[in-house]
Structures are given as C-alpha cells and as structure tokens.
C-alpha cells in the first residue's frame, strides 16, 4: 500500500470485454477514474480504427454544439452551468442526439438567413423613406437652377482654375433645366466627401451633388451602424448616367428610383411607411422566436456538451483496444493502483449488469517489465505542495516523494526570506478568506488563470502567512518596527543630567551624538537569553545590521546544510527501497562523510561560537579567551583548514605568568597573558589542527570512493553474469555499457561535490532577501508613514495622514507583499528544486493519467489545463 511518502503500487491489468458490454464498462471506469489505458493500436492511424465512424459522428455533433454556443454568445445570453451528475448516454441514443442537434442547427441557420434578408429589406425601406422625405427639398426649382448653372460653367471652362485639358462629349452647356437628369440614393457619411470629389473629377465638374444627413437611424436591428447621407446627383446625358451609376457602386452607395412627380412621391412615401411598419413587426416576431430558441438551447447546452464529451471520450478509449479474431471481444491493457483493483472489478461488474450482457468482463493482472506511472493519493491540502514538486519533474516510480517534507520546509524557508509579522498577517487573512469561502468559490467556477493559481495554492499561502508571522516575531520585525513584548535585557546606564549635556553639545556643534552601551554595565547578564526572538532594543541601534546580518547569515547556513543533509538521508530510503547495498555503502556513506566532515563541521563551529564565545573573558576548552576580539573567524578558519596552515594552539601565551603583558578578570581572579598575533585565527579547542586534518582526509578520500567503486562493482557483476539493476528511467534502454555508467557516475559525483559548495552559498539568499525586505519596509515606513505622522498643525493633517496611510497600504501590498512575496516564493522553489531535491530526487517518472470523466469535464469547462 502506498502513501504520500511513496507512490502507489501499480499493476498492469488486461481486461477482456464482450463487444456489447465494452461501452458501458468503459463508462463505469470513466466515472471511477482509476484506470490509465494503454493504446494497443499505436501503429494504426486514426482512420482505420474500429470506432472511427462513431468518433466522426461525435465530431459533427461537437461542431453543431459549437455553432449553437457561438449564436448564444452573439446574443449575450448567459449559459448556466449544469452541476447535476450526467451519466454517459447509450450508443443507441446517438441518433436521437444527432437529430435534435441537426434540427436546432437547421432552425437557427434558417432563422439567421431569414433575419438577414428581412433586415436588409428593412434597411432599404428606411433608406428609401429617408430619400423620399428629403428629395423634395433637393428637387426644388432653386436647386435645379443652381445645378444647371454649375454644369454649364464647367462645360464652358468657367468652373475654376483647374484645366481639364481636352474637351469631351460632356462639354456641352445645359440649355434648359428640363435637360437635367438626376440620381438619388444613400451613402455613408464617412465616404460622402470622397464620393463627391471623385464624381467632380471624373465627370470634370459635370455632375452637381447635394447631400443631406439622415437624422433617423436606418439600422434598428443591428448593434453596429454608421451615419448616412441622402444624396442627389444632377447631370445631363444618359452616358454620364451610366458612369455615375458605376461610381455609386464603387462607393457602395445605394441608388433609389424616385418619381419626379410630387404626388407620386407622396403616394410612394405613404406606401413605404406602411411596408416599414409591417416589416418591423415581422422582424421583431422572428427575433423573438430566435431568442426563445437561443434561451432554450442555452439551458441545455452544458448538459449536451458533457453528454457528448463522455460519449466521444469513451469511443476514443475503445479505439485504443485490440480486437480478437472473432470480432466479438475487445482486449484492453491499463495501469491500475493495486489498492483500487477491487473498485475497478466492481465497476466492470456494474457495467456488465447495466449493458444487459450475460458474459462478465474479465480482469487479469499481468507481470511486466514496463515502467509504471507514478500516482499519489492527494487531498485539497496536499495537492498544492505536490504541484510545486511536479512542476520540476514527476517522481520516479516508488521514489521518495519530496512533497510531505515540502509542506513544512517550503513555507518556512519562504518565511525566513519574507520575515515580517505584519505582512504575514495580511497574507494569512487573504489565504484564510480563500479557505473559508472555498466551497462558494468552487461553485462559481471562475476561469481566470491568475485567480485559479492563487486559489489552487490557498493552503500553501496560508502556511506561508503563518510561518511569516512566526519568523517575523523571531526577527522582531513588524512593518520594520520591533514589538516590546518581554521588555529588554539592556538598560540605559546614563543619567538625565549627562543626556541633557550631550544634547546641548550636539545642538552647539550641529551634530548627532551617539551613545554606546557597554555590555559590561548596560546588559543585564542575570536576565539570561531573550525569551523569544531578537531584543527590541536593536531596532534603535545604529549598528543593528552589524548584529542582525551575521545572525541571519549563519542561520541561513545552518538551515541550508540541515536541509541538504536531510535530503541525503532521504536518498537512503531510495537505496533501501531499491535494495541497492552498493549505493548505501559506496554512495550514501561517502556523501554523508564528505558533507559532514566539511559542512556539518562548519555548522558545529557556528553553534559552539554562539554558545561559548561571549564578550566576557573566560576559559573555553581549557584555553584563556581574552574577549570578543579573539572570537574565532570561521570563514578564514575553514580556508586554513583546506590549506592545512599551521596555527598557534591558543589565543594567548604566558597565561598566568609574570611574563604576561596584559591581564583580565576571569571568575573573580586576575589572569595575566600575552595575546597572540591575530588571535581570532588560532586554534580554539585541543588538537584542532589534527581533527581538521583527519576530517579533510576523510572528505578527500570519499570522492574517489563515490566515483569509482559503484561502476567497477557493476562491471564485476556483469562479468559474472549476475543480475544488474541499472536504474534506468522509463525512456532509457537497459543495455550494459561501462563507459556510459562511468560517465553517469562521474557526473553525479562532480555534481554532488561542487553542489555542496555552491548550494551552501546558494542558501545565503535566505539572508539576502530577508535583509532586502527589511530595508524596503524600513524605507517605506520612513518615507511615507512617518512623514505624515510628524507633520505639524491641525489644518488638514488628518486628511494628509489618511492619504499617506492609504499610499502606505497600497505600496505595502503591491511591493512588499506581492512583489517581494513572489521573489521569496521563487527563491524558495529554487532552494527546493535544486539544493534539496538534487540530493535524492530523480524526477523523471511518468504521471498517472487515468481515464476520468471528472478531469475531462473540468478541462472542457476551462477549470483545468
């Protein structure tokens, strides 16, 4: 039985279906979602498979549903979600579904066609009505006289300074207004000017045009409309009429024939108005009927879509099965979690019953050397953390899963970099809202990708907020300020008189005087360590970074090496699971020795320095420690360890003798000594040089052991004909090649050795990002909020304070929570993917992707990818 620590045991199963029960059995397996089918017809193309015709019919129905959905979307009709369970339709119902969808499609197509014709006719009637209403004013005697004069002037060459060159057949003056011909119509207002200019130039000013804008909208049943103009064009001669008509067609201007007799125009206008009213009523009834069809279709669209989705996915799955020679039996192969084989058998039994078949489906477990897929049973809490791991790579089959450890380590390392209790509270509140209202938010089926990213990781953000509050109190950082909960271990050794004198001196010299708190008199040594976190007095100190930076830097190293060491420990679980003794003895143990002899030793030095080396003189490990100036330098000490550099055996010599040049009080006694040169670089515990030499030799010897022993051991087993587990992944071949094995082992050895150094340095980002966040928070507080709080006067100060607080809040959320939070999030991901998981995690497995209706429907609804 598997767990979240290791993937589930998988079984390759072979299932024999009767042809009449195969569809229903696959439908039941789709509802269960615990079987990943293997395509047994990979060599066949999609057009030669057994159920290709059914798939094509499903594709055609899908096209019709998409067409209906497009029509619904055009009308801005909401499509309600269908939350009730919909069983997979029976194959015998496909004909009914096809008929219903075909009828609906034909009906909508015919309605759209009729609507288009009716709307065009209605537009033409409205345009004709507008022409008839305005043409009377355009055909008055004054307009005709003006047109005749303009055309005659153009014919005589008096139209203006432009020379048209040679004369043509149109260059005849108009002798009588009765010779004038005219064309009326409608053109878009945006084209009117170009239309008029083109007519003027092409006819050489022999066409006189007048325009009147239509005030009434001519496209009542369209969301898109343009302003239009009624035009009338005066000219003489039938040849020019043909040319004018072509120009009108080119500018998409519609021409309408208008009687010259006013009485006939009036009669025609009345007739047009009646037709317009009738046409409008017909269109409204047609659109009303279309709206009813659209609303009825919208109600059932999601239901039809889900039914078709299940139908099509079942036939796609059936196409993956092989057919026996009798054509009466289908054979399938699938991966099934071993713990769920009973449920799969029960689903097959239910499918057989529902299909009415008398022959049950038979499931056989197969022995195979195929690489199984990886499957973890997850819940809504663990899913987010597993997604972080899977984004790097899917775990190998039965490999140790990093996700359980990531649940704690990921938000904690994020919080070490984020480290602000105030911002952590905001993050916690936001994540809590997602968790509290998660059922309501899930039911809303929000498809926004950014929202779903945050909502899917709501429990990750929740723990990130909790740990940010915890580390914020450890750093005693609340919006860049400290909180005085337990008081302070430091006391002010200066009296009021001295402080007043120092203020006066500072004012006289126009300088800021700083006070120094000597630990001997200003620190309460009897108080002991601060109960929790950092003493709040450090927030007031000028040298607070000199104190906080080394603390955070060393803490980062401790956390980093601890996590890397834990990763190596997890690799032991993989070796035990693989029953690989050679990996345990000649890979795991040398890795532990290499990491321990150098980096764990460094961590022990950090802890010992914190515990033993204080500001007061003392005897430490039998050696006189004169004071903080002799506190050992760990970095240079580590370098000296690799260089095997000789060092003095203690911090001082001539201790307790008359030759001592200096003295200190240790345990109430005066002790004389002579301090050694660069005392902070000398040995600080007995036989330190010997111990470090031994550790260095062990670390150096571990490297060739990691590099050489395993490849030659595998070669020895191969030469003896013994079984060799090459540990190949799903995409690799199992042929023995000593050169490949040697190169592979060399890469892993070099990666581990160099990685121990580079990864340790990489963990310093925990300190760097914490410092950056603290400094940004301090700048924001100083430059925005404190500025408003220190403003004098009462007039408008409250409004200014509110304004600055609003700005402070917006910048805090946008910069310090979102931007800095995203930065810390990405760095935490890097530390887990590279520094932690590289010690034990392969990440080259195959994701278990069962045939599951729930997953398919979520992808169809746009909720999953």
Swiss-Prot record:
Subcellular location: Apical cell membrane
One GO term of the biological process aspect: nematode larval development
Annotated knockout phenotype: RNAi-mediated knockdown causes larval lethality at the L1 stage. RNAi-mediated knockdown at the L1 larval stage causes reduced growth rate. The progeny of the few that reach adulthood is arrested at the L1 larval stage. Rhythmic defecation behavior is altered; the defecation cycle period is extended and animals have a slight arrhythmia. In the intestinal epithelium, pH oscillates once per cycle as in the wild-type, but the oscillations are diminished in amplitude and cells are relatively acidic. Also, luminal pH oscillations are reduced.
Main localization of the protein described in the UniProt heading: membrane
Residue spans, topological domain Cytoplasmic: 1-409, 475-556, 605-623, 710-798
Coiled coil: 51-121
Membrane topology, from the record: Multi-pass membrane protein
GO MF: ATPase binding; proton-transporting ATPase activity, rotational mechanism
Keyword Nucleotide-binding (UniProt): no
Residue ranges, Extracellular side: 431-453, 578-583, 645-688, 820-865
Membrane spanning stretches: 410-430, 454-474, 557-577, 584-604, 624-644, 689-709, 799-819
Keywords annotated in UniProt: Cell membrane, Coiled coil, Glycoprotein, Hydrogen ion transport, Ion transport, Membrane, Transmembrane, Transmembrane helix, Transport
Cellular compartments per GO CC: apical part of cell; apical plasma membrane; plasma membrane; vacuolar proton-transporting V-type ATPase complex; vacuolar proton-transporting V-type ATPase, V0 domain
Family designation: Belongs to the V-ATPase 116 kDa subunit family.
Role noted for this protein: Subunit of the V0 complex of vacuolar(H+)-ATPase (V-ATPase), a multisubunit enzyme composed of a peripheral complex (V1) that hydrolyzes ATP and a membrane integral complex (V0) that translocates protons. V-ATPase is responsible for acidifying and maintaining the pH of intracellular compartments and in some cell types, is targeted to the plasma membrane, where it is responsible for acidifying the extracellular environment. In the intestine, required for the rhythmic defecation behavior by promoting acidification in the gut lumen following defecation.
Subunit structure: V-ATPase is a heteromultimeric enzyme made up of two complexes: the ATP-hydrolytic V1 complex and the proton translocation V0 complex. The V1 complex consists of three catalytic AB heterodimers that form a heterohexamer, three peripheral stalks each consisting of EG heterodimers, one central rotor including subunits D and F, and the regulatory subunits C and H. The proton translocation complex V0 consists of the proton transport subunit a, a ring of proteolipid subunits c9c'', rotary subunit d, subunits e and f, and the accessory subunits vah-19/Ac45 and vah-20/PRR.
Protein name: V-type proton ATPase 116 kDa subunit a 3
Organism listed in the record: Caenorhabditis elegans
């Amino acid at each position: 039985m598997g767990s979240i620590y290791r993937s589930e045991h998988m079984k390759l199963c072979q299932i024999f279906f009767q042809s009449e029960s195969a569809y229903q059995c696959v439908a039941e397996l789709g509802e269960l979602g615990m079987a990943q089918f293997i395509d047994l017809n990979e060599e066949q193309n999609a057009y030669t498979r057994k159920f290709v015709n059914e798939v094509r019919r499903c594709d055609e129905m899908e096209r019709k549903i998409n067409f209906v959905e497009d029509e619904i979307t055009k009308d801005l009709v909401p499509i309600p979600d269908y939350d009730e369970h919909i069983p997979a339709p029976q194959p015998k119902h496909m004909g009914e579904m096809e008929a219903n969808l075909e009828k609906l499609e034909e009906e909508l197509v015919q309605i759209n066609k009729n609507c288009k014709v009716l709307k065009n006719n209605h537009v033409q009637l409205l345009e004709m009505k507008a022409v008839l209403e305005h043409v009377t004013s355009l055909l008055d005697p004054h307009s005709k006289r003006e047109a005749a004069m303009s055309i005659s002037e153009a014919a005589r060459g008096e139209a203006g300074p432009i020379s048209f060159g040679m004369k043509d057949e149109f260059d005849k003056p108009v002798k009588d207004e009765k010779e004038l011909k005219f064309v009326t119509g409608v053109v878009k207002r945006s084209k009117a000017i170009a239309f008029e200019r083109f007519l003027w130039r092409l006819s050489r000013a022999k066409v006189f045009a007048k325009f009147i804008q239509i005030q009434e909208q001519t496209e009542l049943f369209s969301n898109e409309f343009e302003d239009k103009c009624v035009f009338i064009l005066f000219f003489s001669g039938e040849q020019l009429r043909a040319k004018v008509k072509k120009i009108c067609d080119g500018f998409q201007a519609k021409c309408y024939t208008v009687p010259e007799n006013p009485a006939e125009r009036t009669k025609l206008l009345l007739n047009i108005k009646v037709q317009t009213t009738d046409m409008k009523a017909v269109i409204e009834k047609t659109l009303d009927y279309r709206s009813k069809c659209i609303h009825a279709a919208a109600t059932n669209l999601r239901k039809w879509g889900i039914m078709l989705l299940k139908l099509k996915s079942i036939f796609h799955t059936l196409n993956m099965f092989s057919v026996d020679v009798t054509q009466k039996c289908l054979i399938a192969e699938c991966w099934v979690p071993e713990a769920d084989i009973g449920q799969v058998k029960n689903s097959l039994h239910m499918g057989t019953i529902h299909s009415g078949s008398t022959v049950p489906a038979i499931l056989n477990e197969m022995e195979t050397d195929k690489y199984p897929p990886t499957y973890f049973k997850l819940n809504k809490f663990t899913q987010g953390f597993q997604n972080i791991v899977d984004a790097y790579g899917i775990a190998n089959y039965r490999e140790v899963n990093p996700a359980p450890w990531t649940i704690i380590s990921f938000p904690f390392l994020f919080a070490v970099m984020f480290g602000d209790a105030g911002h952590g509270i905001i993050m916690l509140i936001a994540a809590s809202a997602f968790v509290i209202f998660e059922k309501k938010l899930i039911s809303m089926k929000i498809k926004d990708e950014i929202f779903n990213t945050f909502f899917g990781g709501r429990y990750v953000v929740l723990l990130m907020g909790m740990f940010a509050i915890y580390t914020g109190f450890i750093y005693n950082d609340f919006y860049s300020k400290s909180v005085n909960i337990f008081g302070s271990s430091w006391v002010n050794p200066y009296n009021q008189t001295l402080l007043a004198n120092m203020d006066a001196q500072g004012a006289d010299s126009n300088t800021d005087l700083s006070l120094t708190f000597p630990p001997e008199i200003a620190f309460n040594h009897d108080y002991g360590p601060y109960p929790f976190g950092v003493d709040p007095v450090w927030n007031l100190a000028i040298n607070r970074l000199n104190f906080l930076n080394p603390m955070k830097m060393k803490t980062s190293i401790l956390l980093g090496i601890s996590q890397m060491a834990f990763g190596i420990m997890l690799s032991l679980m993989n070796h035990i699971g693989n029953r690989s003794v050679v990996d345990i003895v000649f890979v795991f143990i040398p890795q532990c020795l290499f990491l321990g002899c150098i980096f764990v030793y460094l961590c022990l030095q950090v802890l010992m320095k914190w515990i033993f080396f204080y500001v007061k003189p003392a005897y430490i490990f039998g050696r006189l420690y004169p004071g903080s100036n002799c506190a050992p330098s760990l970095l240079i000490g580590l370098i000296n360890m690799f260089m095997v550099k000789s060092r003095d055996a203690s911090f001082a010599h001539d201790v307790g003798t008359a030759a001592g040049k200096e003295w200190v009080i240790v345990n109430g006694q005066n002790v004389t000594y002579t301090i050694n040169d660069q005392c902070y670089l000398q040995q600080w515990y007995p036989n330190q040089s010997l111990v470090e030499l031994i550790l260095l030799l062990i670390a150096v010897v571990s490297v060739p052991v990691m590099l050489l022993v395993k490849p030659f051991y595998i070669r020895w087993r191969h030469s003896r004909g013994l079984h060799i587990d090459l540990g190949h992944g799903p995409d690799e071949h199992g042929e023995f090649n000593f050169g490949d094995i040697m190169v592979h082992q060399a890469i892993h050895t070099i990666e581990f050795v160099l990685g121990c150094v580079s990864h340790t340095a990489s963990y310093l980002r925990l300190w760097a990002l914490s410092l950056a966040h603290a400094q940004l928070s301090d700048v924001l507080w100083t430059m925005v909020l404190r500025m408003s709080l220190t403003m004098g006067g009462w007039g408008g100060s409250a409004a200014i304070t509110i304004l600055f607080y609003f700005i402070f809040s917006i910048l805090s959320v946008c910069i310090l929570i979102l931007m800095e939070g995203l930065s810390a999030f990405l760095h935490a991901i890097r530390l887990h993917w590279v520094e932690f998981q590289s010690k034990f995690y392969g990440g080259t497995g195959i994701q278990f992707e069962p045939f599951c209706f729930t997953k398919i429907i979520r992808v169809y609804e746009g909720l999953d990818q």
